[in-house]
Each structure stands twice: as structure tokens, then as C-alpha cells.
């Protein structure tokens, strides 16, 4: 049935969805700049982004199921590190739209070049990184951000090339260790095939966003970094069936 409907889904994207998606990027970016950056209205840099991400999921008819968010979401006012596996481009919309908590992204510097969106993200405090970003500079910016907001990171550092969970890098857990912030593992299932690398055509797939038990720091230092990283990866891997 999905193969039969796919040509109609592609036609829907070409004639309608992508045009509306582009318009949403422009309108959301302008709204964030006006209310979040210039007038500094409370949550003016956050709520428009949440609405944009949810509308994008709805626009492309992508159903998102959220599991255990209320059970494992830290109390209000507690800043944490949200760490999720990275299956595909749609992870960004799913996470920002459905985490239901204000946070800042650590994102690739290439996103800064996206018209309107890059300017809005930079103006509202999201952290851009590339391979030449000094580790000390990244840590300083992340620690400063964690004073006022939570952080969202993909510990794999890039999208999965085969749909499987990749190796985690230590950066996010070094930040959690240095700030003594709790890590909230999040597993994303179903987004790998939605927008494959090098393809503009969205492929329909339901997505499940699962929250796991928060992992608190056990002391401070390299052992704590390894502990946070191992526990986070194990929680996500168990849900993905990759133990």
C-alpha cells in the first residue's frame, strides 16, 4: 500500500508541502528575530521554533509518538543535557517540536548558511561547531549556555549512514561532567528513511521519541565522563534493539 501511495505523496510534496515548508522557515525565522532577539519577549526565541517543527511534521504527514516524556522529564527550572541518537534530518524537527522544554542546540556550522534560519539560530544563542572549533571554546560556550538553558546534542556527531547506532563522542558528556548536569537519554526510531542523504524527497514513516531515565553524575572526572557516555548509549541501544 505504501508503494502505491508514494507517487501521490511525492506529488503532494512537489505541489504543496515543500513550498509551505520554505514559507514556514522564512516566517519562523523572522518571528524569532523580532520577538526573541530584538524585543526579547519571554520564550519568543523558543515557542515559534516549536510550532515550526510540529507544523513541519504535520505538513509532511509524519506521525510522532512520544513515550515516557512526563515520566522522565526533569523538574521545571532544572537544566540538563538531552542526548539522542541521530538517524536523519527529521530528528531535528522531532526533538525540537516534542521535547517540550526550552533548550539550545549544538549544531553543525553548515546550518548557519541556511537562509533566514541560520541568522535566527545564531541570534538566539544556539551553538555552531565545525571540525576546526577549538574544544576549549566549545566547552566555554556550552557551560555558559547550561547556566540558563538545557542543551540538545547528538553524541554520534553526525547522522547514521546505515540506520544503526554509531560510536558516541565524549564532548557532550565532558560538558555534563564539568557542569555537573544530568543527562537525559532520548532514542529516536523511524526517522532514518524519512529524508535519506542526498535526497530531497520525504519518505513517509512514523517516528517514536522515547525518553529514558535521567542519568546523574557520579562524582567528577574522566571516570564520570565514561559512566555518563556508557549509560546513555546503553539506554538508547536497548530501545533500538542494538544491545
What are these regions (language model features)?
Residues 1-65:
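N-terminal membrane-anchoring alpha-helices
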Residues 1-2, 66-69, 75, 234, ...:
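Soluble, non-transmembrane catalytic domains of enzymes that act on hydrophobic metabolites at membranes
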Residues 4-7, 136-243:
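Non-catalytic C-terminal accessory region of glycerolipid acyltransferases
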Residues 28-50, 58-59, 74-133:
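Catalytic core of membrane glycerolipid acyltransferases/transacylases, capturing the structured
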Residues 54, 93, 173-174:
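Active-site phosphate/pyrophosphate- and oxyanion-stabilizing loops and adjacent acidic/basic residues
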Residues 61-67, 133, 192-193:
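Short gly/ser/thr-rich secondary-structure transition/capping motifs
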Residues 62, 126, 180-181:
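Short glycine/serine/threonine/alanine-rich loop segments
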Residues 66, 82, 105-106, 126, ...:
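Generic preference for hydrophobic
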